[in-house]
């Protein structure tokens, strides 16, 4: 039940876009087409669902203070948390590279439409942010970290597909010239963020 609460909260309450404003570059640049946005969103879900649990295990058994005591008691005082950023980024980059090769092989049309934004998932701050938030929240099991990673990815997917659908609908609307493009996208993001704030009253026991 606790994992379910973490999963739902990471989608609607601690949404990467609306609560933390993470991953905004690709969110704004790619969200002009629902199909492309959905493809990128699924890729982000995949990367987060894999990297967050892996980085959780890395933190618990390698990086944190005393994590290496499982090897031998002499390593009980070793603290490798200064390597957190380097190793987290290495894991993320490796998973993204594998994902890029798979997408290019099996869905070349999606690969072409995503362009540079697919490999840039490796430096998407939402991906790194999820692993760092996971570390900060100090989850008690790999299942909880998986729920958080999967939920964070789905939350980002909902955000980018939602705004892409709205931007497609207003494409032929009369929008003031000064607000066209990024301007109206920011306004829409703010309105969607306000809508997601309605979930703040939900509590999990």
Q: What do these predicted ranges mean?
A:
Residues 1-4, 60-82, 131-146, 205:
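Helix-coil boundary and interhelical linker segments in multi-pass alpha-helical membrane proteins
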Residues 21-29, 100-106, 117-120, 125-139:
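Generic transmembrane alpha-helix signature in multi-pass membrane proteins
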Residues 5-18, 78-92, 147-159:
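Structural signature of hydrophobic alpha-helical transmembrane segments
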